[in-house]
Amino acid sequence: MAIQQRDSRGGTNRDARTNRRIKAREVRAIGPEGEQLGVLPIEQALARAQELGMDLVEVSPMAKPPVCKIMDYGKFKYLEKKKQNEAKKKQVVVQLKEVKLRPRTEEHDYATKIKKVREFLGESNKARITVTFRGREMSHRELGQKVLQRIIEDLREVAVIEAAPRMEGRQMFMILAPNPRMLQAQRDRAKAAAQAAPAAAPQPGAPAAPPAAPAPAPAPEQTPEAGPR
C-alpha cells in the first residue's frame, strides 16, 4: 500500500501522519487485516491501535473523512524500503554504445566491429553504428549504405532497427536495439541454470559417501622349498 501525505503546497511528503499527529476529529478506520471499522472518533481509533500495539496511519488524507489504517508503521516502512531497493537492483540501465566504421572497411576490422556490436546487444544495450565519410567519399554514399545494410543482415537474429540509416553531416548512422526474442532466450537460459544449480549441489545433511574399501594386500611370494641333497 502506497502512503503519501500531501503538504500545504500540493506536493507530497514521504511520511504520513501517524497517531497523535493526525488532525482530523473523526476518521474512516481500517483494521490491520484490511477490515472496515467504519467512521470512528479519532480517540476511539487511536485506542483500537494502542490495544493492538500498533500505529494509526493516515493513508488517504484528502478523503472526507480521512482514511486511517491500523498497522505496524515501522515494519511497513522497512518493507517498503526493501522493495524499493530490490526494484532498483532489477532495473536495467540501457546505454547507447557507438561503433564507428569507414565506407571501405577491411574484412578483419569489420568482423571485430560486428563482434563488439553483438556484445553490446547481448548486454541489453543499444548500438549506434556510424559510417564516417572523408573527402571525396561523400560522393559515394552508397558504400555507407551497403555497410549498414550488411550489418543489418548479419545481426538480424539478435537486433532490431530502432533508427533507420540516415545522414548527419559527414556521418551516416543507424541505431540497433536488442531483439526481444534474444533477450527472452537469455533470461530463460539464466533461469534454467539457476534452477539446475541447487539440484546439482549436495543436499545439506545428506550422509557422506562411505570411503572406498582399501585394496587387498598382494599375497606374499612363495619361495620354493629346498629338496633333500
From Swiss-Prot:
Ranges where the record places region Disordered: 1-21, 184-229
Q: Where is the protein localized?
A: Cytoplasm
Q: Does the keyword Lipid metabolism apply?
A: no
UniProt KW keywords: Cytoplasm, Initiation factor, Protein biosynthesis
Keyword Transmembrane in annotation: no
Segments of skewed composition (Pro residues): 204-221
Give me the Gene Ontology terms describing cellular component: cytosol; membrane
Q: Name one GO molecular function term.
A: ribosome binding
Quaternary data = Monomer.
What this chain does, per the record?
A: IF-3 binds to the 30S ribosomal subunit and shifts the equilibrium between 70S ribosomes and their 50S and 30S subunits in favor of the free subunits, thus enhancing the availability of 30S subunits on which protein synthesis initiation begins.
What family, per the record? Belongs to the IF-3 family.
Q: What is this protein called?
A: Translation initiation factor IF-3
> What is the organism of origin for this protein?
Anaeromyxobacter sp. (strain Fw109-5)
* Name of the gene: infC
